[in-house]
Regions:
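Anionic ligand-binding catalytic core segments
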Residues: 11-65, 113-174
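Charged phosphate-binding loop/patch that engages nucleotide di/tri-phosphates or the phosphate backbone
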Residues: 176-180
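Short, small-residue-biased leader/transition segments that mark boundaries at the very start
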Residues: 1-13
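A non-catalytic, amphipathic alpha-helix used as a structural packing/dimerization or gating element
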Residues: 1, 69-80, 162, 166-170
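Conserved metal-phosphate-binding beta-hairpin within the catalytic cores
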Residues: 92-113
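A long amphipathic alpha-helix within ATP-dependent nucleotide-binding catalytic cores
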Residues: 59-93
Length: 180
């Protein structure tokens, strides 16, 4: 996990190694659970202890077990996918996984995963901690919107095309194939 320090609202700075710079690789991935918000609202990051209590409300007697299973599965998935992406020239700086339970109580993926919409992908080439990184994700469109606050949230065609090109480049790097 390479996120910048501002991305950790549930973390105290004392939880992180000293001397980190923006975009530094963390020694180990950080698991940050969140609750699923209503449509239109933002998911809320919570502590691991809060995740146990939250799960306990819905699954009495299972909160601790499910929280541990979610944490362990999330970190294992991230590590496996991050290693693969790295072998293809991409750093997965951060990502989110959404899980649910099926009718038998088995954990299942509940939404997209490891897409440019749910992750931050950086090229290995040119990676240099200490500042923001170029990316293959929606950050380009976000940055454009942020730098044009008077805009009515309409992206110009060239920004849309550049975002599409970034997604396609990422796809090709990961799969080795062109998207038709």
């Amino acid at each position: 996990d390479h996120r910048d320090l501002h991305s950790f609202p549930t973390r105290r700075s004392s939880d992180l190694p000293e001397g980190l710079k923006e975009s530094d690789k963390l020694p180990e991935p950080i698991y940050t659970p969140s609750t699923k918000a209503e449509i239109g609202d933002h998911d809320e990051n919570i502590s691991y202890e809060q995740s146990i209590a939250h799960l306990e409300k819905y699954f009495p007697g299972k909160g601790e077990e499910y929280a541990a299973k979610l944490r362990d599965c999330t970190i294992a998935l991230y590590k496996k996918c991050a290693d693969y992406a790295l072998s293809r020239g991409i750093i997965i700086a951060d990502t989110k996984f959404e899980f649910g339970l099926d009718e038998n109580g088995n954990m299942v993926i509940g939404d997209e995963m490891l897409t440019p919409d749910s992750s931050r992908f950086w090229p290995v080439e040119g990676y240099e901690p200490g500042h923001g990184q170029p990316s293959f994700d929606k950050q380009f469109a976000r940055d454009w919107l942020t730098s044009h606050p008077d805009n009515d949230w309409t992206l110009p065609d060239d920004v849309v095309q550049k975002t599409i090109d970034k997604y396609l480049q990422c796809y090709k790097m990961i799969t080795g194939e062109e998207l038709a």
